[in-house]
């Protein structure tokens, strides 16, 4: 009965996530492309064969991500994997409509096979408090070991706690005690490139040709059309969306690849690997027994030494 209930809850959560994704695509198509769940629709795995997490394909700027994972954990135990996504307080970025908006953050944690998001009934009160307002999603039904979060308001979520449940090799022979690797990614801010390959408005716009800027047209929505005349008298028009600020003016001479705008991006993506040891209880017991044995041996050696010293003293040596 409990298994059936968990299955129903899992399918309900997946349905809600899918529904939210579809609605966001319909009503906010350009905004949603910056969010972690877009990777779910385009990549079977969020990590490429090269080791790169696919979020870096859209979030081109690099910024640090920090992870805190315990060195070792017991079987069938709940532990915290903490992802820290640092950036300056009160930092604003350019939204899809060109206005300044607070940064949002997201994270992905790729756990080893067998590890997964801990069920809520096993969360401690501390974990419940630390994860309040955070919604965790499995990358897919088949990949319970890959968990994504976001977008979340960055000012209150620079540190995201992932409650993780370790496997129990004593009940499932597919898993073994030993050292395992985790792959972790953290992002702050919008991407620079959409999955379609088009630029967002959160990137530097450059000239595709050399020449002289003939004129700059300002469009009603605040975007620009920069008309560039080359040496042959041909006009090339570069479209700049609302958001980035122009750093050129009419009659400026430019070369292909020169920037037309500033760089509005203040965010970035970072990834790292971490390790955790799934500790066997028998190994712990053996280690304790070893230390006890070493301690007893040292005590016996000290006692033996004192005994020898007494004998030598009695014999006048």
Swiss-Prot record:
Its main location: membrane. Residues 1-34 form the signal peptide. It is found in: Cellular thylakoid membrane. Binds 1 heme group covalently. GO terms for molecular function: electron transfer activity; heme binding; iron ion binding. Keywords: Electron transport, Heme, Iron, Membrane, Metal-binding, Photosynthesis, Signal, Thylakoid, Transmembrane, Transmembrane helix, Transport. Heme binds at residues 35, 55, 58-59. Its cofactor is heme. The chain crosses the membrane at residues 284-304. It is a single-pass membrane protein. The keyword GTP-binding does not apply. One of its GO terms (biological process) is photosynthesis. InterPro entries: Cyt-f_TM (IPR024058), Cyt_f (IPR002325), Cyt_f_lg_dom (IPR024094), Cyt_f_lg_dom_sf (IPR036826), Rudment_hybrid_motif (IPR011054). One of its GO terms (cellular component) is plasma membrane-derived thylakoid membrane. It comes from the Bacteria. Belongs to the cytochrome f family. Component of the cytochrome b6-f complex, which mediates electron transfer between photosystem II (PSII) and photosystem I (PSI), cyclic electron flow around PSI, and state transitions. HAMAP family: Cytb6_f_cytF (MF_00610). The 4 large subunits of the cytochrome b6-f complex are cytochrome b6, subunit IV (17 kDa polypeptide, PetD), cytochrome f and the Rieske protein, while the 4 small subunits are PetG, PetL, PetM and PetN. The complex functions as a dimer. This is Cytochrome f. It comes from Prochlorococcus marinus (strain MIT 9215). The lineage of its organism: Bacteria, Bacillati, Cyanobacteriota, Cyanophyceae, Synechococcales.
């Amino acid at each position: 009965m409990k298994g059936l209930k968990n299955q129903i809850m899992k399918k309900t959560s997946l349905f809600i996530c899918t529904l939210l994704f579809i609605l966001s695509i319909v009503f906010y198509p350009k905004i949603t492309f910056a969010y972690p769940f877009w990777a779910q629709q385009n990549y079977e795995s969020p990590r490429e064969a090269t080791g790169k997490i696919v979020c870096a394909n859209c979030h081109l700027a690099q910024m640090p991500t920090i992870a805190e994972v315990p060195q070792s954990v017991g079987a069938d135990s709940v532990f915290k994997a903490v992802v820290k996504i640092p950036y300056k307080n009160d930092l604003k970025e350019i939204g899809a409509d060109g206005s300044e908006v607070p940064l949002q953050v997201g994270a992905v944690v790729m756990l080893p096979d067998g590890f997964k998001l801990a069920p809520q009934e096993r969360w401690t009160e501390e974990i419940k408090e630390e994860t309040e307002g955070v919604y965790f999603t499995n990358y897919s039904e088949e990949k319970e070991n890959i968990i994504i979060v976001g977008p979340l308001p960055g000012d209150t979520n620079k540190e995201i706690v992932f409650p993780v449940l370790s496997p129990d090799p004593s009940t499932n022979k597919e898993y073994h005690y030993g050292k395992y690797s985790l792959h972790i990614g953290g992002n702050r801010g919008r991407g620079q490139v959409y999955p379609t390959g088009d630029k967002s408005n959160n990137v530097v716009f450059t000239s595709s040709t050399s020449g002289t800027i003939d004129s700059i047209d300002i469009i009603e929505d605040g975007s620009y059309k920069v008309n560039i005349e080359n040496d042959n008298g041909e006009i090339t028009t570069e479209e700049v969306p609302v958001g980035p600020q122009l750093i050129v003016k009419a009659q400026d001479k430019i070369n292909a690849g020169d920037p037309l705008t500033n760089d509005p991006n203040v965010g970035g993506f970072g990834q790292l690997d971490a390790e955790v040891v799934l500790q066997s209880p028998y190994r712990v017991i053996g280690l304790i027994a070893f230390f006890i044995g070493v301690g007893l041996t040292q005590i016996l050696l000290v006692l033996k030494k004192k005994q020898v010293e007494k004998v030598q003293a009695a014999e006048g040596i």
